[in-house]
C-alpha cells in the first residue's frame, strides 16, 4: 500500500508540481542521531534580577491591543489570535474580546499543509490559543467561563495520547517539521494538562498514563542532543520558540525543565554567535528568505531584544524595526535567558573560537571573537534538498550596523549563494573564494597592492587582501595598523601561495582550500596538523576561550 502511494506521489510531483510533504524535500529530519556533546556546556544558572514590566514590552502589547480584530478566515493563522492575546493581556475591550472568541470555529486542522491536508497549519493558531487559555483561563474577569469552555471544548482541537510526528495523511512515510511537531504536540499535551488540573480524571488526559509526558520528554531531549534541524530558520524559529515558551511556562516540572534547556541551548548559541544583537548565521529554511540582509529580519533577535528590555531598558539595544509578532509573544511569557546568554552577547571576554555542529547533511556555525568584535562564518548549502541558506562571512563591531552591507564581509565564488562555501573562519581569520566587501564609510589607513589596513573603533585593526577570486580578512586588537600590515605582508609576500596558506604574526601556518566541497570545512591544517574538516561529524558545541 505504501509503495503504491509513494509511486502515485512521484507521478503527481512530476506531472502537476503539487505541494508535497515537506520531508521529501528535506525540510524535516528523516533520521535520529546524537551528536558528540563537545566541550562546551549549556549554561543555565540564573542570578540576574529581572523587572516585571518593560516599557518596550508594554508598547508592543499596546500596539497589538489597539489593532482592529482581524478576519478569522484569512488572518486566523497568526494575526487574529495574537490580537486576542494582546487585548486580554492589556485588559482592553474585554467584553468584545470574549464575544469574538465565542464566535470562532476551528479554521483548519493541524500539521503541514499539503495536497492531502489542504486545511493544515491550524497548529499555528492552537499555539497562541493555548497561551491565552493558560494565562487567563483562571481569571473569570478577563476570560469568561463560557469563553473558556468554548476555547477548551471547541477551538483547542488536539488532546489525548496520540503523539504524531508524521505529516498528516502521508501514511507515516514523511516526518513533519520540528515547528509543527512542537506546536501540535505541545498544544495537545497542554490541553490534557489543563483538563487534568481542572478536575478531569480520565486516563485519556493524564499525560503520564497516556504516554504524552515521556514522548514529549524524549522529543525535547533530542533537540539538545541532535540539535535543531531547523536551526536559525526564517520564519520557523519564531514558531518553535513560541511553542517552547508555552511548555516552559505551563508544563509539568519535567517538561518545563526540558523546554527551558532547549531554549537555553538556543540562546547560548545565539549569544556566542552575535554581538549586541547583530546575528546573521547560516540557516535551514527557507530559500525565499535568502535575500534578506538586514539584521532586524532575525526572528530570534525579536525575542532576545524583548527579553533584554526586561533586564534593563537602558541596555545598548539597537533601535530598529523588529519582527513585530514575536516581540508580542516574548512580552507576554515569563521565560528569561540564563545569565551567560545575556552576558556574552555584550562581553566577549578575551575572545574565543567556537564551532556548532548540526549533523550529517547540514552546515556548521563557526564564530571567532575578540574583546570588541565577532567574525561570523556563513556556512554552505548541502544540495537543493538540504534547504540550507548560507550567509556572507561578516565582521561585527559595536557600531550599530543594521545590515550586512554596513559590515566588512566576504563570500564566494560569485553571487550565487548555492555555490558558496563560507566556512573559512579560524582564530581571527576569514577566507573565501571571492573579494572582501568594504562599506564606503571605512577608509584604509594604508594600502599595499591588494592589501589594505583599516583602523576601526575600539582599537581594532582589520587587514584585508582582496582580488576577484579570493578574499582574506584578519582582525587584531591593540596593534598599530600600518606596522601590522607591514609585518603580515612580509610574512605572506607570495600572493599565489596566499590563496592556499597564510602565516600569522606569531608564525603559525594556516592552510585552507576556499573551493572545498561543501561537506568540508575550508580550513585544512594548522602548523601542518590536519584538522577535522568533516563537518558532518562535528560536536554539538565545541570551542576554546582565551
What function would you assign to each model-found segment?
Residues 4-12:
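Sec-dependent N-terminal signal peptides
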Residues 21-183, 208-216, 309-546:
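Ser/Thr/Asn(+Pro)-rich, low-complexity disordered segments
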Residues 133-237, 241-271, 276:
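Eukaryote-skewed repeat-based solenoidal scaffolds used as protein-protein interaction platforms
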Residues 48-62, 70-78, 84, 201-202, ...:
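Catalytic cores of extracellular degradative/oxidative enzymes
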Residues 245, 257-322:
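Extended amphipathic alpha-helical segments with heptad-repeat/coiled-coil character used for oligomerization
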